[in-house]
Amino acid sequence: MDGHSNTSVILHTYQQQQSQLIPSIIPQTLPDGYGLTTTISQPDFSGTNAFINTNPWNTTTFPTYRDNQYTNEVSVLNYPTVYDDFSKESTAGTLSDPSLHGSNSSSSTSDVGSSVDCSISPEPILMPCVKRGRPTENPCWAYFHRIDDQLVKCRLCTKVVRSACATNMTKHLERHHTDDYQKVTGQLKLFRMNDAGIRSKMHYQVADTPLTPIPVLPNSYVLPKMDPMEAFDASQYYTMQPDSTAINAQPFPQFDQPQTSADSQTWPLTHFWPNGAQNNMMPQLGEPSTSAIGASVIQEIRKLNLDSDQKRLELEMDQNRRLLLAQKADEKGRVVKTTTKPYQKRNRKTEHPVWAFFKRTGDGNAECIICQGVVKSPCSSNFMRHLMRHHSTEYNDVYLKWIEKRNVTHPGIHCTSVPPPISFPNKDNVRTEPIFTVK
């Protein structure tokens, strides 16, 4: 009987505390679907023996019960169980594989050697929303942890880096943590080399069969090893084809060049002198040439030809520009100084031939020499479009010069944002239409 009375007293005390605490935390009235308030009835636990015999404040799970019922901190905050401690020095001195730890730095537990003794205190952090579904494989993420989608925080100096990406984080390490930056770059190179090897094995099958030897061409000749000071006669080793324009071969001294082996080498006769200036400049070598001396001479001749073509184009551009300036000066009666150096935005020289028709202005724009029209954002593409719309003849000439120059400097590459020249009607040739009279 005494036990029952004690239980009744405890139940009465708990109901009083419940009636005082719950109304202050949870609202007792809730609106229903019709806009009327409905009163929440108090629960009656007198008939539950398990609740009376086991009180929540006497059990070990009371803090969890309190958090789940009132504060709901467990569902809002994430308390990480493992924290990175960058004050620990790694025994091996190298970073561990970042692919084993995932993308977020909060889940990375690698022992990273750091130049700054910095340990992370266990504090609750909000779990960010990751924008990408794939993991971030850059090892610099081990030095940062996310704050949100745009901000990350450095674990070494606690500075916030905006626009969270691997490039910005690597630049931060390069500027403020040089030793750690060297470790990150080394680990990144190693990771990329391993990743490239794995991908190549996945996409390409490695053949174990040896390579087939290259067959010896029937028209190849064996060149014996020659002393460096002896005179070399091409007629001893090469058969000259009879031709009306062919010139007898003359002996010439061989240059002292080291050979890779003492054995004789086989050289196929696959190269011939091209027709043109080369035959006139080096007639003593004959038509075919397969020696290293001939190859070096060919390269030098090509360089000379490229330089001569480039100089010729520059001279033509300079002459056209001077002629246009002189014509405009005579027409308007003003003197234009051609010796003044134009305003150069870039350190390198403007090489496009369209610059012969434009000059820079003081406000950063460009002015057409032909029509004095101002072109904003001066660049070769805008200049070409201006000539295409207003000066079709000059546009065709500039386009052909540009293609010719590109063939010399960059053979086989044609990169331009303007269309090829077509026939545009000039302003001088006004199209006349027949006039029909209405009777």
From Swiss-Prot:
Protein's job: Involved in cuticle function and is essential for normal morphological development.
Region annotation Disordered: where it falls in the sequence: 93-116
GO cellular component, one term: nucleus
Residues annotated to bind Zn(2+) 1: 154, 157, 172, 177
Name of a matching Pfam family: zf-BED
InterPro entries noted in UniProt: Cuticle_assoc_protein, Znf_BED, Znf_C2H2_sf
Residues spanning the signal sequence: none
Protein name according to UniProt: Protein dumpy-20
Coiled coil: none
Positions contributing to Zn(2+) 2 binding: 368, 371, 386, 391
UniProt GO BP: regulation of transcription by RNA polymerase II
PANTHER family xref list: BOUNDARY ELEMENT ASSOCIATED FACTOR, OS03G0264950 PROTEIN-RELATED
ZnF start-end (BED-type): 135-184, 349-398
PROSITE patterns the UniProt entry points to: ZF_BED
Keyword Repeat attached: yes
